[in-house]
């Protein structure tokens, strides 16, 4: 890992720290944060309205992650509002895999549905759409994923491929919400309270699917966070989940939701039935249901920790490839992400399930997983994803071991971590500047800070952590280094600023004693 001081090249604002943070995120025009290209005016919105008005028995096919769950809930509440007979289907991760398939379509046929609407999936379901049509169903695809080149032969809504849409980096749930909003706008029957319930779900999904917090994304996430902090949240399911957060400081931020609420939602789709959370978001706000959802997440944590403790890495590998037996495939992405965070190397974690070897890969920005892996001459059973995350499966071990060997031939550039040299009045002043940029998340991140300082007032906590103080700019500031025992001396310190129940402190990311 290389560490370099970040220097701003453009002056966007007068405040030095604010200017550096904006430059760090490649934001050179404040309109990117303040401007909103919304509402959407889809090219084929009239066809959507006609199709919705035409059919009374409608099936929704959603995905099992947070985005798909929220998108399913949005479309379900919309169709119920119109008095439709609506039925939603979310596939099982292990049995069905991602997206639309013949098994899910058969459920819609058995339910006597005449129209299928996909949410957060379907843009690459060419054969599946044909299968549905051959059985007498019409199909509307709503998705935000990129097409492999060919589109399904049906009505499709995807902001990436609609010339009327100026900002397309939105999640699947927001695509669903924008269609619902467009329907009511064209009918001149907008119910603000009802739509607020839906946009809150789309905002939560925007955080979960790590969408850039620009344009309309920034607007809806900011409003969601504001509603939560002012106790004005409309969706009771979201309110109940927020109430279960182990949050000891105020206000709640988008990052808090990302780390505390989103994993709870995703856990049901990873280990059990994502429909639990759809039920929570669409009217079943029982204590028993949320207890079950929380319980599934606790199980997910325990299984993840157990599996992670058994992983043994070959440190000679350029790219880590692990094959674990008897692991729930819903944990693969979490495990590869945990290894990546610790090692900063691209990582794949695989397991054997249903006669297939399935895996999940994660990488930093320095190595494009999708581009590099798709260039390999390997017989994949399935492959898909994007720059930093991919899913792969093999039908036999020979192909897997060929992949494990040949993936080592890639050159992985050394990742670079940029920092801002700390030269500011106080942690309080810095925190106020950071707070002024909320919501913070994808597309608007805070770099690490750096100082070279003597440490003092050292306290060892639980025999493995070190609390200490640093004298900077005529005042002492409190720091903590987790899983590290320190002694007095001069140190190079990389840190991030955290708001804790005990006040602001620097959380150490990297620390090294300066040689005398």
Walk through the language-model features, giving the residues of each.
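Beta-strand/loop nucleic-acid-binding surfaces
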Residues: 471-487
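OB-fold/S1-family single-stranded nucleic acid-binding modules
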Residues: 501-516
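Beta-strand elements of well-folded, non-transmembrane domains
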Residues: 422-426, 474, 497-499
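Short, ordered beta-strand-loop transition motifs
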Residues: 314-316, 352-354, 457-466, 500-503
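Flexible glycine-rich surface loops and low-complexity tracts that mediate binding to linear polymers
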Residues: 489-504
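Hydrophobic helix-and-loop "lid/oligomerization" segment in the mid-to-C-terminal part
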Residues: 2-115, 135-137, 185-404, 415, ...
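Conserved phosphate-handling catalytic cores of large alpha/beta enzymes
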Residues: 109, 118, 123-129, 139-211
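Long, low-complexity segments enriched in small/aliphatic residues
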Residues: 425-469
């Amino acid at each position: 890992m290389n560490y370099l001081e970040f220097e701003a090249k453009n002056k966007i604002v007068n405040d030095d720290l604010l200017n550096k943070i904006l430059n760090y995120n490649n934001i050179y025009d404040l309109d990117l944060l303040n401007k909103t290209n919304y509402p959407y005016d889809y090219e084929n919105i009239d066809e959507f309205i006609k199709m919705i008005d035409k059919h009374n028995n409608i099936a929704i096919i959603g995905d099992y992650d947070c985005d798909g769950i929220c998108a399913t809930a949005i479309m379900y509440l919309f169709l119920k509002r119109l008095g439709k007979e609506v039925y939603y289907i979310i596939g099982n991760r292990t049995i069905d895999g991602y997206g639309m398939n013949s098994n899910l379509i058969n459920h819609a046929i058995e339910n006597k549905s005449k129209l299928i609407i996909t949410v957060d999936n379907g843009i690459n379901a060419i054969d599946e759409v044909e299968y549905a049509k051959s059985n007498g169903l019409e199909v509307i695809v709503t998705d935000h994923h990129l097409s492999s080149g060919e589109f399904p032969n049906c009505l499709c809504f995807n902001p990436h491929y609609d010339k009327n849409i100026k900002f397309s980096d939105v999640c699947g749930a927001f695509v669903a919400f924008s269609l619902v909003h467009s329907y009511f706008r064209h009918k001149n029957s907008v119910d603000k309270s009802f739509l607020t319930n839906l946009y809150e779900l789309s905002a939560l999904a925007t955080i979960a699917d790590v969408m850039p917090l620009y344009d309309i994304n920034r607007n809806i996430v900011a409003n969601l966070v504001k509603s939560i902090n002012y106790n004005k949240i409309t969706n009771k399911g979201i309110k109940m989940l927020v109430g279960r957060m182990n949050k000891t400081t105020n206000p709640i931020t988008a990052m808090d939701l990302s780390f505390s609420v989103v994993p709870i939602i995703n856990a049901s789709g990873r280990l059990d039935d994502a429909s639990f959370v759809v039920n929570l978001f669409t009217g079943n706000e029982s204590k028993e249901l949320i207890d079950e959802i929380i319980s599934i997440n606790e199980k997910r944590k325990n299984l993840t920790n157990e599996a992670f403790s058994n992983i043994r890495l070959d440190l000679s590998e350029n790219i880590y490839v692990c094959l674990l037996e008897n692991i729930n495939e819903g944990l693969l992405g979490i495990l590869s992400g945990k290894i990546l965070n610790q090692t900063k190397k691209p990582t794949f974690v695989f397991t054997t399930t249903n006669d297939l070897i399935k895996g999940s890969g994660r990488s930093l920005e320095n190595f494009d997983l999708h581009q590099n892996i798709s260039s390999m001459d390997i017989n994949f059973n399935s492959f898909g994803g994007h720059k930093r995350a991919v899913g792969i499966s093999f039908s036999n071990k020979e192909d897997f071991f060929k992949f494990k060997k040949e993936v080592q031939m890639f050159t992985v550039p050394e990742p670079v971590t940029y920092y801002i040299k700390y030269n500011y009045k106080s942690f309080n002043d810095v925190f106020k500047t950071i707070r002024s940029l909320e919501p913070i998340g994808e597309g608007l991140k805070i770099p690490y800070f750096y100082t070279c300082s003597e440490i003092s007032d050292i306290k060892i906590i639980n025999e493995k952590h070190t609390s200490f103080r640093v004298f900077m700019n005529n005042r002492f500031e409190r720091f903590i280094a987790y899983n590290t025992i320190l002694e007095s001396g001069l140190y190079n310190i990389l840190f991030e600023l955290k708001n804790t129940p005990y006040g602001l402190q620097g959380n150490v990311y990297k620390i090294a004693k300066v040689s005398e």
